[in-house]
Amino acid sequence: VGDEVVVYGSVTNYMGNTPETATGEAYLYSLKSNGGSTGGDDNPGGGTGGDVSGNSITVTASAFGLENAYDLTASGLTLTDGTTVTFEAGGNTNGPKYYTSGTAIRMYPKNTMKISSSKTIKSVVLNCVEASGTKCVADGKIDATPGSVAVDNLTVNVTSINSKETTITNSNPNTGTVNQLRWSSMVITYAE
């Protein structure tokens, strides 16, 4: 009660007194809790939202239960600890998407992922995948603001963040699988 819920999509009136949306035609755009009960899952993108251990949270892309080719610019993700992950196309015609093939989130050239938390973020580790023998780490062309990026095989390490938010960008200007950033899991570590 008292919460603000914004849903994007067409609403119809069922039986004269119940607003509803067509399955798969609408999504939760935002949820602002004003101290009331949400009455359900307030996790855009669905799923578990990560496993907290000590001062870190581990997120597996497949655990969110997203459909194949799910467009992440539509709603982003909310983790169990309240951290949000939002995605932007960044000028690319293809925005970040989740694919069941490879169970990974694909970030195409110019795509961004912004991680925001109420806690200070120390580091982020993206565990990436291969596609037909090609390592999908954007050919090493990844930036973080704030943060320093180092790529080691299929692992992208973002360190020296020391902020409550960071934006990770696939800075590779080229197209093709080798220029995509595809991650299957992520570990966010917070400052103690």
Feature locations, PLM:
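Short, surface-exposed beta-strand/strand-loop-strand elements in extracellular ectodomains
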Residues: 130-150
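Extracellular carbohydrate-recognition regions
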Residues: 41-82
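Short beta-strands within extracellular/lumenal beta-sheet-rich domains
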Residues: 95-118, 153-154
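Extracellular beta-strand elements of beta-rich domains used
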Residues: 184-186
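Short beta-strand-plus-loop segments that form exposed binding edges in beta-rich domains
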Residues: 168-181
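OB-fold single-stranded nucleic acid-binding module
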Residues: 1-45
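A short beta-strand element within beta-rich, extracytoplasmic domains
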Residues: 119-132
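Extracellular glycan-recognition surfaces and repeat-rich motifs
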Residues: 73-99
